[in-house]
Amino acid sequence: MQNDEGKIVDLYIPRKCSATNRLISATDHAAVQINVGHVDPNSGLYTGDYTTFALCGFVRSMGESDAALNRLCVKHGLAKAI
């Protein structure tokens, strides 16, 4: 919800899992948020930009977080397909 000035005034904004599109509840203490940095292809240095991914506890408990993160990085062009 926004006020008259256009600022977001909600107390809690739920996140969605980047891999499954499930809502991450406030009580999902196994969920993680990972920032993947962008690297310049020529110099190999960090550019200061990053992409944020959120993984829910369900994905982590199934042991699929590594595969999900790899798939998301390939989809967003942050890594090469293996």
UniProtKB/Swiss-Prot annotation:
- Under the GO molecular function aspect, what terms does this record hold? structural constituent of ribosome
Q: Where is the signal peptide?
A: none
Which Gene Ontology cellular component terms are annotated?
ribonucleoprotein complex; ribosome
Q: Name one GO biological process term.
A: translation
* PROSITE patterns assigned to the protein according to its UniProt record, in alphabetical order: RIBOSOMAL_S21E
One matching Pfam family: Ribosomal_S21e
Q: Which InterPro entries match?
A: Ribosomal_eS21, Ribosomal_eS21_CS, Ribosomal_eS21_sf
Q: Which UniProt keywords apply?
A: Ribonucleoprotein, Ribosomal protein
Entry keyword annotation includes Ribonucleoprotein: yes
Question: Its family?
Answer: Belongs to the eukaryotic ribosomal protein eS21 family.
What protein is this chain from? Small ribosomal subunit protein eS21
According to its UniProt entry, this protein's organism is Cyanophora paradoxa
